[in-house]
């Protein structure tokens, strides 16, 4: 019986999903196997669609050329759709995520306006980088310096060591980092923005997989599967599924 299952698994066509390390969405467990919210959601969705999924680590800054060249089929990893709707073909949004600012506990920064003249670190090419660079939102003050770092973990190291006054990222990422490294940062109550998280396919990918994925993820949200997966990783899982008001 088991051998039949394995055979069936290996005969399914493979979807290559590219991501970088972004706990709790996607990371390697103790055995070096990719796991996390996005890995579990993708595995289940593609299984329902008749595919098996191969999760590969990519250079996040090269994600667009990798998906356009066909080296990977799609991109996941807590990937915000906001401002990128024309760059990719999207499945989703399947999760609503808050982009927030975090500071050290003893900081005198309590609201976004307190960031004026301060130094803030972000992971490069992420949504917060654009928010602080472009400053199209009048709530965003002029920083002293915006420091863009290649790896997610580095922004927290910079904050912990006092090289910067604040960091900006997805709330889930900050909460996860504090859990993993026993760090104590304070998250500002006022979010930078609430973004929809999606699965990105190449703009000219007309295989229909993206549309099928979008439908399957929505079915998983409706039938409680997504909630079950998210609650393994995050408290208050329901709030991450409130995607109806995002407007795309």
Model-derived features with residue positions:
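Short, well-ordered beta-strand segments
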Residues: 15-20, 102, 119-122, 167, ...
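A ligand-binding cleft/hinge motif common to bilobed small-molecule-binding domains
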Residues: 62-65, 78-87, 131-134, 158-194
